[in-house]
């Protein structure tokens, strides 16, 4: 890349480097060095060659990496949670929400935060987080579970599969 900056296919060179780094990313429980390197290269493709197929594919791969990192935070949080190390678990769950807000793991992370707050006796914090969960994910199974641990059993006419939660504002 350094020696051929003016080449008409330089975008492809950057893309190949990013894909190579992406393929070296390992499982959720492994070291993040390769992951961060892949993120850097993928972002470089996205920023330098926006609007290209390379940038589009790099964006998809970057999203997958972010989901993987969020999953790792969640797994570590559960590890601490299972050992009743609630503050360490809370930090990991909050990291999922703050660092990976577009990941598929935010719903569960919010629910786990509620669990921690309930375990610590922080009822108002649990309710506030449940409001956030319900606002952002009103039809989520995690929202129904949150309702049950904060407020008790769901009303009979409300079911996770059957709906009704959109009309229910249990935390308001």
Model region roles, listed by residue range:
Residues 1-172:
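Acidic, polar-rich low-complexity tracts and alpha-helical solenoid repeat scaffolds
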């Amino acid at each position: 890349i350094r020696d051929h900056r003016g080449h008409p296919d330089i975008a492809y060179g950057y893309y190949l480097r990013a894909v190579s780094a992406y393929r070296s990313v390992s499982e959720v429980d492994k070291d993040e060095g390769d992951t961060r390197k892949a993120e850097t290269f993928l972002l470089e493709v996205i920023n330098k060659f926006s609007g290209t197929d390379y940038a589009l594919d790099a964006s998809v791969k970057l999203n997958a990496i972010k989901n993987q990192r969020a999953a790792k935070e969640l797994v570590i949080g559960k590890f601490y949670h299972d050992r009743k190390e609630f503050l360490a678990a809370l930090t990991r769950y909050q990291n999922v929400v703050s660092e990976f807000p577009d990941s598929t793991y935010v719903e569960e992370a919010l629910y786990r935060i509620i669990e921690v707050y309930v375990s610590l006796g922080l009822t108002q914090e649990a309710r506030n987080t449940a409001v956030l969960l319900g606002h952002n994910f009103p039809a989520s199974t995690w929202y129904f579970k949150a309702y049950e641990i904060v407020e008790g059993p769901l009303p009979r006419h409300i079911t996770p599969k059957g709906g009704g939660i959109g009309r229910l504002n249990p935390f308001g």
